[in-house]
Amino acid sequence: MTTGFLQKIFGSRNQRLVKQYQKTVAAINALETQIETLTDDQLRGKTGEFRQRIAAGESLDKLLPEAFAVCREASRRVLKMRHFDVQMIGGMVLHYGKIAEMRTGEGKTLVATLAAYLNALAGRGVHVVTVNDYLAQRDAEWMGRLYNFLGLSVGINLSGMEHDQKQAAYAADITYGTNNEFGFDYLRDNMVYETDSRVQRPLNFAVVDEVDSILIDEARTPLIISGQAEDHTELYVRMNALPPLLERQIGEEKADGTGVEKPGDYTLDEKGRQVFLTESGHEKAERMLAEWGLIGDGESLYAPQNITLMHHVYAALRAHTLFHRDQHYVVQNDEVIIVDEFTGRLMPGRRWSDGLHQAVEAKEHVKIQSENQTLASITFQNYFRMYAKLSGMTGTADTEAYEFNEIYGLETVVIPTNRPPKRIDKQDQIYKTAKERYDAVIRDIRECHERGQPVLVGTTSIENSELLSHLLKQAGLPHEVLNAKQHAREAAIVAEAGRPKRITIATNMAGRGTDIVLGGNVEKQAAFIEADESIPADEKARRIQQLHDEWETLHEQVKTAGGLHIIGTERHESRRIDNQLRGRAGRQGDPGSSRFYLSLEDPLLRIFAGDRVRAIMDRLKMPEGEAIEAGIVTRSIESAQRKVEARNFDIRKQLLEYDDVSNDQRKVIYQQRNELLEAHDIAETIGAMRHGVISEVVRQFVPAGSIEEQWDLPELEETLRNDWQLDLAIQEMVNESSSINADEILDAVTTAADEHYEAKVALVGRESFSAFERSIMLQTLDRLWREHLAALDHLRQGIHLRGYAQKNPKQEYKREAFELFAAMLDAVKQEVTRIVMNVQIQSPEQLEEAAEQIEEQGGQLGNVEFQHADFAAAAAAATAGGAVVADATAEMVGHAMSHSGPAGEVPRVGRNDPCPCGSGKKYKHCHGKLN
């Protein structure tokens, strides 16, 4: 109450910021007359002048009014578009490292040019990040004319580009590209073996378009570069026969034995999207697997030798019960392609992790691709936080403002519209059944069609969009369907969605990034005419003028009919996605309207609010086909959405806390790699490692401060001779000197190791040997880092079970991950020292051969894939401790079974200690063994 009273007097934080920025806009407008008098060359020359002033110490903030005025004037001349005052405010918000929320149609693409131009003047690079290649290419070509006019270079970073093209794109002043490609390039840069092979510069400033989609919807899933691992194709095919033999149990058994309506083999929790085998399900699964010869008669699925089978059972079960064709994925060209749950777009190349994708492939009887081993991974949360300055734009950020601030430290500023919005958002209508809902939708569409009003219908899945398309065909209503299957025609369909009587069905936010202009997008049609070389120039001009005249008539016709009408056929889990759909109408002060039609059979209502709404309908004795249209129901639905959003935020926050652990380790490894790549000579590093390793070897047999009776000299001599190529008569040395102590023995062995090393260097020369050492160090570091990532995955998937032992899973994960990391660094030292001490060379040519041989033996993985992984696996770890219910609890259970046990405490690994990888072998026979 006090807050509201103070806001009335002083205004909200948002209002105060906008008012502050408006003063700067006034200063920019005051410069406009002066800037307009400049010739094109003088205007272009301002860029060089600004750069000199920056070099002399002037700040970007001080340059802002003049730079924005120059950018606006250049845009007016080149693009025939003058930035509105509100767009100037948007540009300032981006420059100051905040998020600008701007309504659809307010010109976000043009706003980005202001902040990009100003920050590019510093010469450290600006990345403009979009959600797909089409938008990156469109914006780079469209806005590139403006930047080129002002003397700045523009690069486009697309997937599949050649290495030198990427280097050129990143060297440009402003680089357009997709979030995935920027992230993958960062990972690839940290896998190279030569400094010249890197493409990125240090991450300076990023403007993220559709920031909510990239930093929130996509943040939960990591980017993964992977290579093929062991092949279990046959096992997936065998396991695929199991789920159809199992029956679902209806109801959960309570403590008193009641609650089960229909006994079965597995339970399904739709709210948490979990699946669990019941006791009878376990017995039936074990019986079937024994019949198929996959386990022995009477054996348990939990027996150590059957651990991996449990993982495959759950993968198959999840594939059959939780993942549905044309909703979660489509099958095209003998391939399972994931459908993005937020945008409805197809995501070719992206695969679910941990065997789920293979299980779905087996279910659909398409070719099963091999499982992969992770080579490198990073989440968008951690990638984008590495930029020195980060900003973003979207039409819907305010509902997630808390998360942006909490995770990324980004403040959200709502930018006023250039013209007052005229869209009318009508009350939701709720029906008892989906059939009644669709009947009402068809009625509404028919009414709009008859009065010439264009309609955009939003659905939540491909399946629903095709069902609605079928109903419209039956009703004789012509329409266009825009879902993942029509991806190639997306821009063309959206461009025409504002024409009179046009009916367009869109899956979620497919087509985002292209404006729906009332009367149709005349610029798109004009571009097609311009591109047609067979039409003479004067004929082109005549046709384009005719198009503009026709558009004026159509535009007025649609405005009179009420503008674009938005129909939502289902509420999404997130209010933000609903707002994005609504936001397609009423652009730039145009009229428009929106309404959501819901049914009690919708997942959101059924899971969160169905019983309450059904009770209201029963109490009111609602006849069939009659809808509830009440504020209390809409508020109830929004409350359910807030619960889901809060749950998803908790998942993302917990995921980040887990990922921060591996992120800190990733930074250490990548920093060490970069130092190795840039160092001219790493002899000092190799020497320090050698001394540490030799000291550890000697101390195993001759402990510090011990007496002669405690020494095991024969074993020490044998170990040095077999493992380190050092032939020393230590027993003889001790016999000859009665006063020798443990430290002197260590000194003698260290000196011998140094001499052995120097003799190798002398044979081939310091420069050649240094290159060999660098190569071996990088290969060993990369291989052990890969194995470490796999170990962290296993640790994370089973860590939630520590909660049952009254331990904090998060703290346990941090502790054990650190111990694994320390063991990995020790293993790197051991292995590099072992290779350098054992390599037999006589010439530089032999040295190159040895390096190649070690690389082959190191198991370089082929068929490298770049994936933006599925949320399911990531959420599994985030929900550790049971604080939050996630999409993939079944996956957690499956992997808890497949994990061979918690990582042991290994502060330092001795030769005879168990190997920290969990194989059960001694370290010297496992990761301590020379390949």
UniProtKB/Swiss-Prot annotation:
GO molecular function, one term: protein-exporting ATPase activity
Domain of life: Bacteria
Obligatory cofactor(s): Zn(2+)
Record CDD domains: DEXDc_SecA, SF2_C_secA
SMART domains: SecA_DEAD, SecA_PP_bind
Record function comment: Part of the Sec protein translocase complex. Interacts with the SecYEG preprotein conducting channel. Has a central role in coupling the hydrolysis of ATP to the transfer of proteins into and across the cell membrane, serving both as a receptor for the preprotein-SecB complex and as an ATP-driven molecular motor driving the stepwise translocation of polypeptide chains across the membrane.
Name of the protein this chain belongs to: Protein translocase subunit SecA
Taxonomic lineage of the native organism: Bacteria, Pseudomonadati, Pseudomonadota, Betaproteobacteria, Burkholderiales
